[in-house]
Regions:
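C-terminal catalytic region of ATP-dependent kinase domains
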Residues: 42-160
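Conserved kinase catalytic-core segment
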Residues: 1-64
Length: 160
């Protein structure tokens, strides 16, 4: 074991926001204080919080109906509300743009097979391709809408 060094509180907050966005992306229905763990990186001598997933409670495959964390407007899965809550942070916008640029569900499925050696059954692959394809479309559309709203606000302020 090793002694953990102090971590920057700002970094922990950013990671938590990113993980909360991911939970929203996968429609996590079992988000609670018990579903978090600590990952230790012995090489870098650091730790970070990480979500723990019950696979039957995300990607619309589960039946649990528990309380899900909401955004300031009370929504559970709407990306627009999440973007409005955190869109004033430059690092957050950069992160979202990287997600949009790098998203490739087919590559993720292939990487899963390469890393685990397990072939995902066709019907399950199709479910995830459809689910993540739809969520990505909603994600990207909501982000573009927020950007357009921000540009419109700036233009209105310039006119005044």
């Amino acid at each position: 074991m090793f002694k953990l060094i102090s971590q920057d509180i700002d970094t922990i907050k950013k990671e938590f926001i990113k993980q909360s966005l991911f939970n929203r992306f996968v429609k996590q229905t079992d988000e609670n204080n018990h579903n978090w763990g600590i990952l230790l990186n012995e090489k870098e001598k650091r730790a970070r919080i990480a979500p723990i997933y019950d696979l039957d409670c995300c990607c619309e495959s589960g039946t649990l109906r528990k309380k899900v964390r909401t955004t300031s407007d009370g929504s559970k899965y709407d990306f627009g509300a999440f973007f409005r809550d955190f869109g004033d942070k430059k690092w957050f916008n950069k992160y979202v743009e990287e997600v949009i640029e790098d998203f490739d569900i087919n590559k993720a499925i292939q990487n899963a097979k390469t890393e685990t050696g397990i072939e995902i059954p066709t019907e399950i692959k199709e479910h995830y391709k459809n689910f993540f394809g739809e969520r990505f479309y909603e994600f990207k559309g909501a982000y573009q809408k927020i950007l357009t709203e921000e540009i419109d606000k700036e233009q209105q302020n310039e006119v005044r």
